[in-house]
Every structure is written in structure tokens, then in C-alpha cells.
């Protein structure tokens, strides 16, 4: 097993490459920069988010739509597939408003990783519903198998919500992507969208942010699965 801190993926000219030197599929998003102009950034923060959707192709298509007014640098699917939508030294539109450690305009100094996941679910008449009120059938066909029931610190009253779990394959690939980014740009801090936006829930309780952060930043030894 790969030692934490050693990235098997790599970054060349701010584009992501696999360990066999093949480039990750790149679909440039029009939703980047500012006022129609590209903006170069020096990233020092990594932001973890979910797509609120069920597949990678849908997320990439959405980020390719100018009407979306949203994007991320890279998307990681449930089967470990990866697509890049913006070079890592370009300002993507993934963070929105909010501040972190007294700094605003987080898009201008961070890299955003989106993971394919439906995100927050609400139970209505015994059925899990997505934020669009669509019935959640479960990634494995049975929502009882892959939904974590837990509160979220941004939800008043501690209401219990549903959170589709991330696959181990997906988590392993996100780990590789994040380690490559950290190695290239010297990033020392990884947070969730939820950490600086009280109206956001991603990546949510199903994502093992604490152990993921430790592993990516080289603060945790050993292998095994990610602790939730």
C-alpha cells in the first residue's frame, strides 16, 4: 500500500495526470475567472464538496453550462473516475461567499474537489428525498444499505438527516488526487464547504474529513479504510 504523503498521481502545468503519465480527461469549464477573464491563483487551501448528483458525467455537463455559474477544479466519481474542469492555478467558482480565517473570496486562493454524491436527504413519509424532492433509490438499489443517518452541525435543532455514503474506491481516488495537489502546491489545510458556509452541508457526515485530512497531509501512518 502506498505510504501517506506519496502521491501516485501528478500535476504537470497545473493539469492532473495518472500514475502512468496519461492525462486525466479535461473538460474546460466556462465558469471561471472574473468578469469574463481568466484569473491566475496561488492556492493555499483545499475545499471538499459533493455534486448533489448521481454521476460524474452529469456534474461535468453542469459545470460546462454557463447558466450553472458554478464549477470545480476536479470531479471524482463513485467508481474512481476523474475529470478535471479547470487548471489548478485558475480561479474556479466552487466556494461562493463566506470567509475562512478572516480571508474572503475563497475562490481566489483555493482548489475545489467535487465528489459525486447526492448529499443531504430528507425523509418524507418513510422515503428518502433529495434536495430536489426526487426519491432517492440508493446507489446500490437499496437506500437502507448506503445511507448514514446523522445530524449536521449546520442544521438547527439537530434534526436527523440522510447522507449517502462514499465508496471506498471513490475515497481512495480522492486521496490520490488530494495528495498530488498538496505535494504540488504545498497546501497545509483541507476543509469542507460546510466549514465556512452555514447554508451548505457538503461534504457531509458521511465523508471522513478528519481522517482524510490527516492521511492526505501525512499526519497519519498506516493503511486500511477511512474512519467515519
Located regions from the model:
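N-terminal catalytic cores of peptidoglycan-degrading enzymes
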Residues: 1-107
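Basic/polar, cationic surfaces and motifs that engage anionic cell-wall
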Residues: 2-20, 39-40, 116-228
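Hydrophobic "anchor" residues on beta-strands that sit immediately upstream
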Residues: 45, 110, 189
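Conserved, surface-exposed functional patches that form binding/active-site neighborhoods
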Residues: 105-110, 124-127
